[in-house]
UniProtKB/Swiss-Prot annotation:
Gene that this polypeptide is encoded by: thyX
One example of a Gene Ontology biological process annotation: methylation
Other information: ThyX activity is mechanistically distinct from ThyA activity.
Motif (ThyX motif): 74-84
Cofactor dependence: FAD
CDD domains: ThyX
UniProt GO MF annotations: flavin adenine dinucleotide binding; NADPH binding; thymidylate synthase (FAD) activity; thymidylate synthase activity
Pathway: Pyrimidine metabolism; dTTP biosynthesis
Organism name: Helicobacter pylori (strain ATCC 700392 / 26695)
Binding-site residues, FAD: 50, 74-76, 163-165, 169
Cofactor note: Binds 4 FAD per tetramer. Each FAD binding site is formed by three monomers.
Official protein name in the record: Flavin-dependent thymidylate synthase
Species classification: Bacteria, Pseudomonadati, Campylobacterota, Epsilonproteobacteria, Campylobacterales
Family, similarity comment: Belongs to the thymidylate synthase ThyX family.
Domain ThyX, first and last residues per copy: 1-208
Length: 208
């Protein structure tokens, strides 16, 4: 999985929004320590979390499984633009068979699938991938029908935009060891991709 933060709102946008409430602009230090502390105090300590919604982050996420994508979509206050299987399944048409299930073919399958810590599950995922390949390349089934045979482990690619308040909620829930392992990995990757000067707002959300 690869996560890149493509764009983000500067912190001073949030501090200026907060200062609008009290008309305390004269106390600003132009995005310095005072303003950063203000955002944390008002947004995190005093729980006026709506002030954090002024901060927005735009991520590119590569290599997330379709199964994990379903869980990501449950965090509704966010925007997702996802690689279309209807238009991109042609990537499998010219690929050679993934059988037999040997080390070489399993490694080839990793280009398309997220593997887990269970060899039997991974083997069944590769068989599902092979069935999908056969539908596309040998039976010439259209993408919009063949997509129903896609394994949950199939990798996707998306643009993901979320505000700081919603991201805090996501990190709190998905960094827990009760979350799906792939979602735990995503939570860590999103945090790590944040600009360093923003991470202090989210540190208390991480469960491990």
């Amino acid at each position: 999985m690869e996560v890149i933060c493509k764009h983000y709102t500067p912190l001073d946008i949030a501090s200026q929004a907060i200062r609008t409430c009290w008309q305390s602009f004269e106390y600003s230090d132009d995005g310095g320590c005072k303003d950063k502390e203000l955002i944390h105090r008002v947004g995190n300590i005093f729980r006026h979390s709506s002030t954090l919604e002024h901060l927005y982050y735009n991520f590119e996420i590569k290599g997330l499984s379709r199964g994990a994508l379903q869980e990501l979509s449950r965090h509704r206050i966010a925007s997702l633009s996802v690689k279309s299987s209807r238009y991109t399944l042609r990537e499998l048409k010219e690929v050679e068979s993934f059988l037999p299930l040997n080390e070489t073919n399993l490694e080839r399958a990793k280009e398309f699938l997220v593997f887990v810590d269970n060899e039997k599950v991974n083997a069944m995922s590769v068989l599902a991938l092979e069935n999908l390949r056969i539908l596309l390349s040998e039976h010439n089934i259209k993408n919009d029908l063949a997509k129903y045979a896609m394994p949950e482990s199939y990798k996707t690619h998306l643009a993901y935009s979320i505000n700081a308040r919603s991201l805090q909620n996501f990190l709190t829930l998905r960094s827990s060891n009760k979350a799906l392992k792939e979602m735990q990995d995503l939570a860590k990757a999103l945090f790590d991709a944040l600009p360093g000067e923003h991470q202090y707002l989210f540190e208390d959300c991480l469960k491990h």
